[in-house]
Amino acid sequence: MTNNSQIKVIVGMSGGVDSSVSAYLLQQQGYQVEGLFMKNWEEDDSDEYCSAATDLADAQAVCDKLGIKLHTVNFAAEYWDNVFELFLAEYKAGRTPNPDILCNKEIKFKAFLEFAAEDLGADYIATGHYVRRDDSTGHPRLLRGLDNNKDQSYFLYTLSSEQIAQSLFPVGDLEKPQVRAIAEQLGLATAKKKDSTGICFIGERKFTEFLGRYLPAQPGVIETVDGKVIGEHQGLMYHTLGQRKGLGIGGLKDGDENPWYVVDKDVARNVLIVAQGHDHPRLFSDGLIAKQLDWVDRQVRREPFDCVVKTRYRQQDIPCHVEPLDDDTIKVTFASPQAAVTPGQSAVFYLGEECLGGGIIEQRFSGSV
């Protein structure tokens, strides 16, 4: 058995059950374990929105129970500069970004990794993500988590082999019910705490209200695919492709009663374009163009290849053909048309269990490009 007693691991403690159990499992494996709670957002409103104080208290309670030290660090400035401003710029441009992916890239596996190594003397960091690391080839690879329902590799595709080499993912080999069972057996404060669903580090506040504070809303009209004005929107940023609820339009006189879906955004005209029916052709794409590529092995792809892709979290794998257009642009053609492919979101590629990397969806296409 490996002697881990001289190896120091700093666990990112979020105040949730996954990071709590991660710390315990590493302790059981003999590592020197300490926790780190990251504060990445300055509270600017009432406690009902912001759970940071509760999360910190929960993280502290778990560390006390396990007998490990908890450090705290404030990355609010880094979060604002490297995550939030880009997040706002993307929304302003009419796209729908994924801040959790950016947060993992810039905060958890960059700012945290550097702070843990340089200030706390860590050999590794660890998080409660449901992914696995494979070292069998000599270059650390990122694998999907064992629990298919909880696999979070989609959110970690920007990591390099080098970052993975410095990271441990203790719950990646477990299923969520097992993790909760361990927490309950230990009597951890986080055992029954529900999973967070809010934007990374900003909590579960009302999103439209939150976004409206930072970006002035620009109301405009809602048009059908035929150009008929049928309503008004409060701002393109509040809508995403494939959205059905919250449009404020019902059936039209002399029209069918099928629900309306967002099928496009005309940013130049500030017009939201809708169509009726979940199978309307305008909802579907034959493929996409992606840029800002991050391959885990950091090797530029120059030859076409086949694999599977996800264009959003928890989506079924889509067989596809990937054709590099230049070093930072790829054309992806789906085996069958896909609904609601959304610019600003990430396309993430897999070969079997391995996450190869991904990129940001620049545009979607139908027919040939």
From Swiss-Prot:
Main localization category: cytoplasm
MF-aspect GO terms: ATP binding; tRNA binding; tRNA-uridine 2-sulfurtransferase activity
A biological-process GO annotation: tRNA wobble position uridine thiolation
Enzyme class: transferase
Origin superkingdom: Bacteria
Cystine crosslinks: 103-200
Subcellular location: Cytoplasm
Catalyzed reactions: S-sulfanyl-L-cysteinyl-[protein] + uridine(34) in tRNA + AH2 + ATP = 2-thiouridine(34) in tRNA + L-cysteinyl-[protein] + A + AMP + diphosphate + H(+)
Binding site for ATP: 12-19, 38, 128
InterPro entries in UniProt: MnmA-like (IPR004506), MnmA-like_C (IPR046885), MnmA-like_central (IPR046884), MnmA-like_central_sf (IPR023382), Rossmann-like_a/b/a_fold (IPR014729)
Interaction with tRNA: annotated span: 150-152, 312-313
GO annotation, cellular component aspect: cytoplasm
Keywords, comma-separated and alphabetical: ATP-binding, Cytoplasm, Disulfide bond, Nucleotide-binding, RNA-binding, Transferase, tRNA processing, tRNA-binding
Biological role stated in the UniProt entry: Catalyzes the 2-thiolation of uridine at the wobble position (U34) of tRNA, leading to the formation of s(2)U34.
Family: Belongs to the MnmA/TRMU family.
UniProt protein name: tRNA-specific 2-thiouridylase MnmA
Natural source organism: Tolumonas auensis (strain DSM 9187 / NBRC 110442 / TA 4)
Gene coding for it: mnmA
